[in-house]
Amino acid sequence: MGISQNQRISDNPEVSANLRLMEQWIQSQMTYRSLPGLSIGIVYDQELVYARGFGYSNLEDSAATTSQTIYRIASLTKVFTATAIMQLRDQGKLRLDDPVEQYLPWFRVKSRFPDQPKVTIRQLLTHTSGLPREAAYPYWTDNKFPSRTEMIKGLENQEMIFAPEDRIKYSNLGFAVAGEIVAEAAGMPYSEYVEKNILAPLGMKSTTVYFQDSQSKRLAEGCAIYEC
């Protein structure tokens, strides 16, 4: 497929036809999977060549989803945490096989494995630390995530579920601890480090660690599958 330098890729007839086909497929999948809305962007050679929203960002007021709708990214946050850790490693501020307690003296978790090695940063990132999936706090029942203080205090009552490196077990708690290491090694809050060293350099102006009131009108409201 040949495209002249002065022609936008999205204006190419073949590309336009494929985009229309893609849009039809997306709409059919939304119906099949009961998806209320989504946004999609396509980047080619560092240029955004396609961006569009489908469906609704809020079912209650039938607000249309657009290319500017923002979403809670949940566990995709782990990508930012891992990136921050690797940046700090490259800066010589930590090593992946350093024990967690070298940076976080308060990191103490009960264990029934007396000869287990110390938990390392690498194990946090690879879900092989032996830590439970969640912090010892019932936020799944009251929709409230634990604060930093609550997470640290809760560690006193938690127990390793297996010895480090024994197996793989997905752990949100492990990445929360990794975020604390980012803050300690960088000498600044996690949110500040991510914003200065990842989001700003990439021009991710609509991505924030904490929700901003100015984003409220653009934020998609989640819903359970039976509500959609």
Could you describe each region identified by the protein language model?
Residues 1-7:
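Bacterial Sec-dependent N-terminal signal peptides
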Residues 11, 18, 22, 34, ...:
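Residue-level signature of the cytosolic catalytic core of signaling kinases
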Residues 15-73, 106-109, 153-159:
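Short, conserved catalytic-motif segment at the N-terminal edge
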Residues 19, 23, 27, 82, ...:
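Extracytoplasmic/secreted envelope proteins and their assembly/folding machinery
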Residues 26, 40, 46, 70-99, ...:
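Active-site SXXK
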Residues 30, 89-90, 194:
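Alpha-helix C-terminal capping/helix-coil junction sites
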Residues 58, 112-228:
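Short, surface-exposed loop or secondary-structure junction motifs
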Residues 96-112, 201-202:
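Short, glycine/proline-biased beta-turn/loop segments that scaffold the active-site neighborhood
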